[in-house]
Amino acid sequence: MTIIEGCNEFCSFCVVPYTRGNERMRPKADILAEVRAAADSGHREIQLLGQIVNHYAAPDDSTCDFTALVEAIHDIDGVERIRFASPHPRHFSVRFLEAMQRLPKIAGICTSRCSPARRAC
């Protein structure tokens, strides 16, 4: 489930900002509605996607960052596992790391996860 399109980082090796443009965040309400619909249809795992997924900031709720979004998804009945792809180490907050310990539905760090840290960024 895409929550962010584009990127604002402009890493020297990366074409994403030039090909996909600046970051555009989906509204929190739209994401949560899509998660609820997926859970109601029997989907038990939600994977959040974005060029830098953990840089999420809801355009429709100034208090909703990536941690708050994951917490809201965690509270949706039917969701058993939450995964995310392409986080950037710079955007991991202490609050999110604490949420990873506290919320059992958040999948742990996986070797398949694509991260700039793995690409020597």
What are these regions (language model features)?
Residues M1-A29:
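Canonical Radical SAM [4Fe-4S] cluster-binding loop centered on the CxxxCxxC motif
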Residues Y18-Q47:
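Conserved alpha-helical substructure of the radical SAM core
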Residues D40-C121:
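Conserved SAM/AdoMet-binding glycine-rich loop
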